[in-house]
Amino acid sequence: MKTWFITGTSSGFGRELATAVIAHGDRVAVTARDLSKVEDFVGDYPLQAKAYELDVTKPESITAALQEAQRDFGRLDVVVNNAGYGLIGALEECSDEQMLRNIDTNLTGPLRVMRAALPLFRGQRGGHFINMGAAAAISNYAGFCVYGGAKAGMELASEAVAAEAAPFGVKVTVVIPGPFRTEFIARSLDRATGPVGEYAATAGKFLSFLEKVDGKQPGDPAAAAQAIIAAVESEKPPFRLVLGKYAYQKARRQLDKERAELDAWEPVGLPTDFVV
């Protein structure tokens, strides 16, 4: 039986994963900025779940929640960085405050959580980070400059952490979901505050698309939760766990595109070393 620690479990992927973890027979520490939004979950599963207040933008909040959870459960095996939200708008339309807040939540927040949990994992010589990425980090969209950039940065940072902490038995998996039927668009998508009409055909078009498909996304969050559990149970979990047909097709197209560009510019870029 494993003990999971999941950020952002008030709704969406986080709540779905916490429910699946309980059904799997494991224990879970559920967290949210507003504790009242997860207390109902603990009420449903009082023997397997405990709730903790956590804000990924506040280091002291993270440390306190992790320490309390470890004290209550005795051990933490899996730490899931799920808390986050989107920001839609062309770069020129986003305020400094919006950019910094989004990056603080989606990039710096997971780094804070991993940094705080690493001493626990290192001390017990084992642990698994599950970091929620985004298809926008495979290749980005007009309108997701800040959000996709933050998620891509988190993915690359996770790769470094995986290399740094591997000698201690620590594993890292970045989950890359396509469009899943959660409340992300309705409840977790911030809009840029400085709209510029000339971006209507790019960033504006993407926002319209997101609003149109909301509630019709092909991805099943319950199936995604089972895939994440399977990765945690695997002896050789993937670093990148791509979820859903859309994300798989997108990843393959991007790999083909990057290889073609690499090959096309090899005659220019390759012969730039000193001649020995």
Task: Report residues per predicted region.
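Residue(s) in the substrate-gating loop at a strand-loop-helix junction
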Residues: 134
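The beta1-alpha1 cofactor-binding region of Rossmann-like NAD(H)/NADP(H)-dependent oxidoreductases
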Residues: 54-64, 96
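Active-site helix of classical SDR
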Residues: 114, 150-153
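Conserved glycine-rich cofactor-binding loop
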Residues: 10-12
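SDR active-site lid
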Residues: 167-238
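Substrate-binding pocket helix/loop in short-chain dehydrogenase/reductase
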Residues: 90-91, 95-100
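Conserved glycine-rich Rossmann-like NAD(P)H-binding loop of the short-chain dehydrogenase/reductase
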Residues: 24-40
